Design a protein with these regions (language model features):
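Iron-associated oxidoreductase/ferritin-like identity signal
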Residues: 2-211
């Protein structure tokens, strides 16, 4: 992946420090030599653990809203949320496997995810309050993007191209998700018309757009 900026001295990135400080990577397996120092692998794995926790929390919230949304926007949102949580579920595996490739255990309990995630539980949302659901997903996707950028700084400093590629792909995806759901907040029935749109992951959904 082409570098577009100068290196930040290791351990000096103010952005990277935030994500890495939320997680302490567990003991590494012995004998790993993939061209990245043990200390760098530990810091990257810790950052990815936080990123995985953010991603899982957002996945669970998106799935929750897919199940429970009601009202005039049901068809649009039920289908959109399904496309997003399905894609997110697959991505969780990729993130966890990258942590394992670096030689560390991936967080895998609700307690771990709650401790490491920057996304806090929002207030309970009534199924008919679709705007509150959408606003929580805007905030959640933006939080995932911020954590991805923090860990990307750490991976860039260590020349960890696979982690950089993974995080770049996730950034593109979650920035798009944030845009898609944010756009819905500018539109509310009856001042909308339905048209066919394209959701992420190749799924089609009926999107509402302003007249």
């Amino acid at each position: 992946m082409a570098k577009t900026k100068s290196k930040t001295p290791k351990g000096k990135s103010p952005a990277g420090k935030t994500a890495a400080s939320r997680a302490k990577a567990p003991a590494t397996a012995p004998g790993i030599d993939i061209g990245i120092s043990a200390s760098d692998r530990k810091q990257i794995a810790a950052g990815l653990a936080s990123f995985l926790s953010d991603s899982f929390t957002l996945y669970l919230r998106t799935h929750n809203f897919h199940w429970n949304v009601t009202g005039p926007m049901f068809n649009t949102l039920h289908t959109m949320f399904e496309g997003q949580y399905t894609e997110q579920w697959t991505a969780l595996d990729e993130i966890a496997e990258r942590i394992r490739a670096l030689g560390f255990a991936a967080p895998a309990s609700y307690a771990d995810f709650a401790r490491l995630s920057s996304i806090q539980d929002g207030p309970a949302v009534d199924g008919g309050d679709w705007r509150a659901m959408v606003q929580q997903l805007v905030s959640g996707n933006e939080a995932v993007c911020r954590t991805a950028r923090e860990v990307l700084e750490i991976a860039d400093d260590a020349d960890d191209a696979p982690t950089e590629d993974l995080l770049t792909q996730r950034l593109q995806t979650h920035e798009k998700y944030a845009w898609l759901v944010r756009a819905l907040l500018a539109c509310a029935p009856p001042g909308c018309i339905a048209r066919q749109g394209q959701a992420s992951g190749g799924r089609h959904y009926t999107g509402d757009v302003p007249l």
